[in-house]
Design a protein with these regions (language model features):
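Core of compact, soluble alpha-helical bundle domains
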Residues: 1-131
């Protein structure tokens, strides 16, 4: 079964973040550093992925800016993004197969790569970010 509806995205993202919260490499970032309010965060993530995967314009925030805020509290490193992408791919593979599921994994890899690149630039003092 492929990802075709918002309900599919809600299932994927809910299960994914259940894994994230328990992960020894990145769970603490969400639980302790950022103290994420999941009732608020999950619907935003549903919108984000619905925008990316189903071409519904639901997400209009600045995703990069939010991650710069996180990076200023704790330096986001390759190991963090590696855990994130590994969990995302594992969760997607457990739940879905098909063209959109493959696109979700590809987009997630691209997002992780760009985020890591941008965080590394900031951590090395190569950019001035005022977001």
């Amino acid at each position: 079964m492929d990802i075709t509806t918002r309900k599919d995205i809600e299932l994927l993202i809910t299960r994914f973040y259940e894994k994230v919260r328990q992960d020894s490499n990145i769970g603490f970032i969400f639980n302790d550093v950022m103290k994420v309010n999941w009732e608020e965060h999950l619907p935003v993530m549903f919108d984000f992925w619905e925008t990316i995967l189903l071409n519904e314009t639901k997400y209009t925030r600045n995703a990069m800016g939010i991650h710069f805020e996180v990076n200023r509290k704790i330096k986001l490193e390759e190991k963090h993004f590696a855990s994130w992408i590994q969990l995302f791919i594992k969760t997607t593979d457990e739940l879905f197969t098909g063209e959109t599921a493959e696109m979700a994994k590809k987009r997630a890899r691209s997002i992780a790569d760009v985020m890591l690149f941008k965080m590394n630039q900031e951590n090395e003092g190569l950019t001035i970010t005022k977001i």
